[in-house]
Amino acid sequence: MMNVIEGILNTTLGVVFTWVGWKTYKILWKYTPYSYPNARVRAMEAKLLTEQRFNELAESRTLQNFVASLEDTDYKETLSNVSSYSVEEIERALDASLAKTYELMFKILPKRSRDFFRLMMEEWDVRNIANVVKAKLANEPASDYIIELGPMLPKVKAMAEAKTLEEILVILEGTPYEGPYQELIAGNIDVSTFETELYRMYYKKLLNYARSRKDDEKTLLTEFIKLKIDKLNLMTTLRGKLAGLSAKEIRSMLIPGGSLDVEPLLHIDSIEMTLAQLDSTEYGEFIRKVREEAEKDISVIERAFDEHLIKKVTEFDRFHPLSIAAPLAYVLKKEREVRKLRAMVKLIGDGLEPEVIKEFVGEVA
């Protein structure tokens, strides 16, 4: 009898220890790989430019002074190559610095997470390809519309140098964008539909990736992407209304996969009533705060959405400090910082007064 009891106890203990070992392994596998990268990310976040620093930069007066004022920041490396101090050259240097941020994420993050940042970089490919094609069709210098980011940047630059639309097709051969571009030059779709199709493909790819993740990471990434889609669809709707487009025309430019039901908004005539309709949505709280200003300038909504996006990811990071949330929040803040610096470069280049620059850049998110 004792042997039987001992056997049962041993078996039970074996099962318990196996279960504990498995749970411990899962916890270590899930959280430990983020310990070093997230500690490094938090150190980098402490170096982001403060509002006081932006105010000091606004006093630069010249682009040479602006560049010199950033010598003690992370931008020093890319700005050190600036020689002509033109707006375009400095913008390229700032973009290069942002690209290095993404590259760093590839290096320090766990292998299972770094692919998401690679996918995020592909959005710059979509923007660049759409911008170059639109510029070519409008007979404008395409290189002026390129942002120096994205895995396909060499191909994008080659597209800008192409002499004919057919040359661009050869450059895009074998890429996901070849099919939509073929449809465009064949006359089956217009350039607006072409651009929409690029974004639909991109966000479908992002959502598929997010849904393939597990647990907290799946929750965060799925919500993050849905927020980005909602922002894009809402801005498309508002801009479409301002341009006098019909509900059918706006609907054809929307991206599937978001949480916001845009359909009721399509049948409202005025911007004011459209914004009021958003009160009952999950975005009502932050849109109410800027509604009056947004009725005069809808870009206010875009900036408010970007801030909301950062806030949501930062909140997730607070509850899940050893997750992809910390690096994602940092990249979003870095993108915002670069947008502000780019805006400041243009304003200084145009010779605007420091007080005007401070006011304008304070509104840029």
Curated annotation (Swiss-Prot):
Keywords from the named record: ATP synthesis, Cell membrane, Hydrogen ion transport, Ion transport, Membrane, Transport
Transmembrane region(s): none
One GO location term (cellular component): proton-transporting V-type ATPase, V0 domain
Cell compartment(s), UniProt: Cell membrane
Molecular function as annotated in GO: ATP binding; proton-transporting ATP synthase activity, rotational mechanism; proton-transporting ATPase activity, rotational mechanism
SUPFAM superfamilies: V-type ATP synthase subunit C
Coiled coil: none
Protein origin, superkingdom: Archaea
Membrane topology field: Peripheral membrane protein
Entry's Gene Ontology BP terms: proton motive force-driven plasma membrane ATP synthesis
Oligomeric form and interacting partners: Has multiple subunits with at least A(3), B(3), C, D, E, F, H, I and proteolipid K(x).
Family: Belongs to the V-ATPase V0D/AC39 subunit family.
Function text: Component of the A-type ATP synthase that produces ATP from ADP in the presence of a proton gradient across the membrane.
Matching PANTHER family: V-TYPE ATP SYNTHASE SUBUNIT C
Protein name: A-type ATP synthase subunit C
Record lineage: Archaea, Methanobacteriati, Methanobacteriota, Thermococci, Thermococcales
Gene for this chain: atpC
